[in-house]
């Protein structure tokens, strides 16, 4: 079983870490040290994930990346995402960070949801009704260019091996250790 600790309070989060004999994940989150938000992870939580062998999936929801971006309309960039990744690496280690974009507006996902629920507008209102600009990047309406995260990681000095870990290698390790 793979345990996801996203959206848990401190007591439950640390109880789950203590009870788990396998690595856990936080499927999508940012870090408080870069953007103070109750939803983001404290350094204590990051250290616990690192000690457990788990992985934090870095999200791209702008209100969790840059403080005040929702109110100011400021566009969040890939540099902001990498700031969070840098901090996770600094506190938990390179083996404990990945991508967990928390973004379901990809065309394939939209089409699957539409096929599952034939009622007009029902999917748009829930899955794709996020206001434009509520997610991140230079073009807030299109994250399909997400592969450029690798270019930003290169520019920050990450090695090819470390980039492969961030882009999926770390999560694959945890999946192999938990669900085989």
Where are the language model's segments positioned?
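Mid-to-C-terminal alpha-helical segments outside catalytic/metal-binding sites
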Residues: 131-180
